[in-house]
């Protein structure tokens, strides 16, 4: 085996989470705090990358500190109760790598509990280590 460790992102690499979990959560929260606002999935993807989600929230949408905290709690609750599907073929890729003696590392902004649950619920091989990229530490 040439590369023993396969380093995976989680959202939208291993599981289809933005379209099925994060964007619907965003729309549901907007309905509560900015009912006049309207975004498509494409808008949401684009603005996540430029200017970034926080700039969207604080700039374009003008969220207050209270609304930012509310959005984060709302999103966490939403994510806890919904499991995104793994992309077709990803299980086979990960299993083949593990069966050959390789390691799987996940680097993500997602919560550790969500990553572990998503792997378990999609019957994916358990990652050997999970790094939360925003904290720059492993959990």
Task: State the predicted function of each range.
Residues 47-48, 87-90, 127, 133-134:
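Surface-exposed loop/turn and secondary-structure junction residues enriched for glycine/proline
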Residues 91-99:
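Surface-exposed amphipathic alpha-helices with a cationic face
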Residues 2-88, 100, 113-116:
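N-terminal helical cap/lid subdomain that shapes the substrate entry/recognition surface
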Residues 3, 94, 126-127:
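Core-facing hydrophobic residues within beta-strands of well-ordered domains
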Residues 28-29, 96, 121-122:
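Alpha-helical structural signal in soluble globular domains
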Residues 99-101, 124-125:
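Short, well-ordered coil/turn elements that cap or connect secondary structure elements
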Residues 105-106:
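Structural beta-sheet core signal
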Residues 111-138:
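Substrate-recognition "cap/lid" segment bordering the active-site pocket of phosphatases
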């Amino acid at each position: 085996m040439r590369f023993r460790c396969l380093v995976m992102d989680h959202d939208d690499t291993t599981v289809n989470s933005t379209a099925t979990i994060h964007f619907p959560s965003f729309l549901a929260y907007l309905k509560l705090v900015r009912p006049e606002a309207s975004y498509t999935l494409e808008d949401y993807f684009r603005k996540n990358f430029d200017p970034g989600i926080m700039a969207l929230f604080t700039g374009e949408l003008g969220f207050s500190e209270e609304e930012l905290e509310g959005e984060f709690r709302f999103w966490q609750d939403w994510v806890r109760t919904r499991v995104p599907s793994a992309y077709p073929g990803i299980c086979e890729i990960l299993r083949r790598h593990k069966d050959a003696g390789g390691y799987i590392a996940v680097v993500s902004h997602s919560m550790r509990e969500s990553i572990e649950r998503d792997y378990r619920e999609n019957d994916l091989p358990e990652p050997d280590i999970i790094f939360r990229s925003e904290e720059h530490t492993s959990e």
